[in-house]
C-alpha cells in the first residue's frame, strides 16, 4: 500500500508524533497504520525506559476541588520548558481529575496512567513522573497556586476570603505544623539540644543555657507552626490572632512545591541539561 500524505497526517493526528517519524513507521509497515501505531507504541516504551533514569525535578502542582475535598498532584519532568508544554499540562490535568474523582493513591494513579505517560515520554523526550498526590477535606476549602510550582489547600471554618489569605500565607511562609502544640516532641528535643549547644558555645553554663533556651523554644515552635507565625499581610499579628479576630479556625493545610526533596544533578547549565535530555 502506498504511503500517502493523508495516511501520514492521520498517523500524526492519532499518535502526536513527528511527520518524519510517522512516515518512517508507515514505510516499515507498507502503509498498515494499525501496525505502525503498535510499533510506535513499542518504540515509545523503549524510549521511556531509557529516560527513566533521568532526574525529573521540574514540573507542576495541580489542584482540583470538589464538594468538601481537594486533590493536589505533583507531576514532574526534567526542564521548566516542558513543564509549560500543552501536552504535559493536559496530562497533569487528566491525572488530577482522576485523583479527585476516585481519591486514588499515587501508586494507583501511576498504574492507571502508565500507558499515557510512556506515550508522552516518547513524544516529548523527557522523563515524566507522577510523584505525589494528597487530599484535604473540610467544611470550607480555599486553594492557592503560586505560578505552577507551589500549590496550597487550606481547610477550616471561615469565610473563603480569609482561608484564601491563609493559603497565600502558607505558600510564602512554609509552616510545617498547624499549631505550636502540634510540633512533635522529638523535633522540639532536637532543637532544644541545638540551642543549648549554641548558648554554651557563647560561654554560658549549662544551667543558664537551659534557662535561656526556654524562650527560644517558644519562638521556635511558633516559627514552624501556622498559627504561631506572623501573618504575611499583617506582620504585627500572628495567623492565630487574625483567625481569632474573625471567629475562624483552620483544621488542616497542605503545601506542595515542585521538586521538594529531589536531588538535582549539579554542575550542568540549563542548556547542558537540555542537550543531555535530547541524547538517546
Curated annotation (Swiss-Prot):
Superkingdom of source: Bacteria
UniProt subcellular location: Cytoplasm
Alphabetically ordered keywords of this record: Cytoplasm, Elongation factor, Protein biosynthesis
Region (Involved in Mg(2+) ion dislocation from EF-Tu): 79-82
InterPro entries (UniProt xref): EF-Ts_dimer_sf, Transl_elong_EFTs/EF1B, Transl_elong_EFTs/EF1B_dimer, Transl_elong_Ts_CS, UBA-like_sf
Entry's Gene Ontology BP terms: translational elongation
UniProt GO cellular component terms: cytoplasm
Main location as per UniProt: cytoplasm
GO MF annotation, one: translation elongation factor activity
Family, similarity comment: Belongs to the EF-Ts family.
Function: Associates with the EF-Tu.GDP complex and induces the exchange of GDP to GTP. It remains bound to the aminoacyl-tRNA.EF-Tu.GTP complex up to the GTP hydrolysis stage on the ribosome.
Record's protein name: Elongation factor Ts
